[in-house]
UniProtKB/Swiss-Prot annotation:
Keywords carried by this UniProt record: Endonuclease, Hydrolase, Nuclease, RNA-binding, tRNA processing
Gene that specifies this protein: rnpA
Taxon lineage: Bacteria, Bacillati, Cyanobacteriota, Cyanophyceae, Synechococcales
GO terms under biological process: tRNA 3'-end processing; tRNA 5'-leader removal
GO cellular component: ribonuclease P complex
Presence of keyword Nucleotide-binding: no
GO molecular function: 3'-tRNA processing endoribonuclease activity; ribonuclease P activity; tRNA binding
Family named by the database record: Belongs to the RnpA family.
Reactions it catalyzes: Endonucleolytic cleavage of RNA, removing 5'-extranucleotides from tRNA precursor
Subunit structure: Consists of a catalytic RNA component (M1 or rnpB) and a protein subunit.
Role description: RNaseP catalyzes the removal of the 5'-leader sequence from pre-tRNA to produce the mature 5'-terminus. It can also cleave other RNA substrates such as 4.5S RNA. The protein component plays an auxiliary but essential role in vivo by binding to the 5'-leader sequence and broadening the substrate specificity of the ribozyme.
Name of the protein in question: Ribonuclease P protein component
Isomerase among keywords: no
Top-level enzyme category: hydrolase
Amino acid sequence: MGLPKTLRLKHWQDFQTVYQQGKRHRHSNLLMRVLGDRQADHSRFGITVSQKVSKKATVRNRLKRQIRAVINHFQPQIKPGFDVVIIVLPQGIGCNYERFLRELEQLFSQAGIIDHGHSRNHLL
């Protein structure tokens, strides 16, 4: 199942706000920008995979689906009120679900958007 539409950043202006004001976190294959303090009962996510990563839309869409699946995996742990943009870097083209899972867990933890009251192993 994909990421519910209520949990997605959909508008260009929302992406721009996160790009301009969000705090940057980087891992080897992913870059994440996080903007907090939004008064909402959930966090919203946007995923960007540029044509620098792959010219083929099918490849870019596959990467986005994998990242959305990882976000769904962590959804019970994610604190509300954040807008997050995840950018796949060109070297991320060869990543699989498990690699994205490890990297996003580290990035979410680094950014402070995961509630550590839940154990990851409990979710698996």
